[in-house]
């Protein structure tokens, strides 16, 4: 059985959703946070007991919607230097080899440089170490650190891959991820 809860805005809604998950229901809902690990902290700040979060949550997905660089008018972006890329988390090797693209504008994209949209997301699997960290009242940075050791990739990681693939331009990456 699947339950969809529009948005978890208060403790009562959270408790109902998580208790339904404990009874074997697959519960989908939304919660406004900047990233996946801070969803756990938000639930704690709403007064949800740690044992309930740890037992009921199996996965948290955080996402942003980005404009896709137009494939018809892509061209190298001369304004994005390796130094700028390194400042945004690219390795020196990635930054020196990267051919960063932008859309210059064409009839297909109505001179915007963008055509279509795509998701930039991160998926936090609630593994045993994450459950233990929740019960130990770990902070958001601590949860993120544990998750990264478990293979977690942030939205920034995914965004950097999309930039290197040419689908996301640097300005759009900065726009959607500077919201944090």
Question: Where in the sequence are the language-model features?
Answer:
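Short, flexible helix-loop junctions that flank or precede catalytic/ligand sites
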Residues: 1-180
């Amino acid at each position: 059985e699947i339950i969809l809860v529009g948005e978890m805005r208060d403790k009562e809604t959270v408790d109902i959703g998580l208790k339904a998950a404990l009874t074997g229901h697959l519960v989908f809902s939304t919660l406004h946070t900047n990233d996946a690990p801070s969803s756990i902290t938000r639930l704690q700040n709403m007064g949800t007991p740690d044992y309930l979060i740890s037992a009921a949550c199996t996965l948290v997905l955080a996402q942003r919607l980005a404009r896709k660089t137009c494939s018809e008018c892509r061209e190298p972006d001369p304004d994005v230097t390796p130094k700028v890329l390194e400042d945004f988390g690219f390795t020196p090797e990635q930054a020196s080899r990267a051919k960063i693209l932008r859309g210059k504008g064409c009839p297909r994209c109505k001179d915007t440089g963008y055509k279509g949209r795509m998701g930039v997301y991160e998926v936090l699997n609630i593994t045993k170490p994450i459950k233990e960290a929740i019960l130990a009242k770990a902070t958001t940075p601590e949860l993120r650190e544990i998750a990264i050791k478990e293979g977690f990739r942030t939205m920034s990681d995914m965004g950097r891959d999309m930039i290197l693939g040419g689908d996301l331009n640097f300005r759009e990456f900065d726009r959607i991820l500077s919201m944090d």
